[in-house]
From Swiss-Prot:
NCBIfam families, per the entry: nagB (TIGR00502)
UniProt xrefs under SUPFAM superfamilies: NagB/RpiA/CoA transferase-like
UniProt protein name: Glucosamine-6-phosphate deaminase
Keyword hit for Metal-binding: no
């Protein structure tokens, strides 16, 4: 596990972009795994501004809310289109289908996509409770793409994106921890003091399902990029 501490979110995002750009230009990265939320927003803005040619790169996304259409402003389809896909050309892009009515079939469909497009670099954020994707504490390390019941803390953290608290979805489709660990390389981004405890448990704590991100200690190629605040407890 390589640890990089930077001055702020912008510097950390630029460092992540350097790694991604190197992988794409060398031809090593054909599939890029993407995350959502506030953490990767600056990375995507920097990628859009860059000269990195992504037209031969396929993208996959970690998760999507159950029940939200792709054109719903709160969906992750919409988020990705607004921040990246409408501004940068990719070969093709895949996300779970939030409107799928058969959860088991949708999870199997997405796993098939992941097997056809092995992830070369997976970008991750981390929740204050150590979740990666929507894999909440207690999730099996052997989990594949699955339908998740969102915890109160995760819904609380995400309610700022919704007009009303009751509009925050209760379920999501998420790549499982095993699905994430299948990526050849992982870049974990964390910025801000509120992520410091989760980062401490991820890097220095035991590998335990109560901190899902701690499983990254078992991955052969992980780069953790932090700002000074997120690194403050290390």
């Amino acid at each position: 596990m390589q640890l990089i501490t930077t001055e702020n979110k912008l510097a950390g995002s630029k460092k992540a972009l350097e790694i991604i750009e190197k992988g794409i230009t060398s031809g090593e990265v054909n599939t890029l795994g993407l995350a959502t939320g506030s953490t990767p927003e600056t990375l995507y803005a920097e990628l859009v501004k860059s000269d990195v040619d992504t037209k031969n790169v396929t993208t996959t996304n970690l998760d999507e809310y159950v029940g939200l259409a792709a054109n719903d402003p709160n969906s992750y389809h919409y988020y990705m289109n607004e921040l990246l896909f409408s501004k940068k050309a990719f070969k093709e892009s895949f996300l779970p289908n939030g409107e799928a009515t058969d959860a088991e079939a949708e999870c199997a469909r997405y796993e098939e996509i992941l097997s056809e497009h092995p992830i070369d670099i997976q970008v991750l954020g981390i929740g204050t409770n150590g979740h990666i994707g929507f894999n909440e504490p207690g999730t099996s390390f052997d989990s594949l793409t699955h339908k998740v019941v969102l915890t109160d803390s995760t819904r609380e953290a995400n309610k700022r994106f919704f007009e009303r608290e009751e509009d925050v979805p209760t379920h999501a489709y998420s790549m499982g921890i095993k699905s994430i660990m299948n990526a050849k390389k992982i870049i974990l981004l964390a910025f801000g003091e509120n992520k410091a405890q989760a980062i401490k448990e991820t890097i220095k704590g035991p590998v335990d399902v109560n901190c899902p991100a701690s499983v990254l200690q078992n991955h052969p190629d992980v780069t953790v990029i932090l700002d000074n605040e997120a690194a403050s407890l290390l």
